Amino acid sequence: LVPSVLEGTKTKGVNGEFTLGENIGDLGGLGIAVVAYKKYLEDNGLEDVERQKFGDLNSEYTGFQRLFLAWARVWRSKARPEMAAQLLAIDPHAPNEFRCNVIAANIAEFYEAFEVEQGSTMWIDPEDRVTIW
């Protein structure tokens, strides 16, 4: 995987062995957030599709969609190519676009929330998805 800002350059992609520990942490963290939200719904006798109101705001998004959109917002960033290349070499975290997209694409509820279908750029075959715990 090569960050989009570095596509077409000679920069090597993400070193999966170098980022493995942080990738596991990200996947575990988002997975726990999904489990916690499901428990909240269950404990309160709710279904996700009923959760159209958020505080005083009406929302066009379901709770699961908001959960994944909040996850995505955390990883918004912009970097110059030089900085992106430097971070690839020294940072044990995957680039933010992968921390966002690849982690979410390994969570089954993401597919349900956004009706992601095979052929989408976000699709990972179920047997190839990674689960933690």
Regions of interest found by a model, annotated:
Residues 1-133:
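Zinc-dependent metallohydrolase catalytic domains
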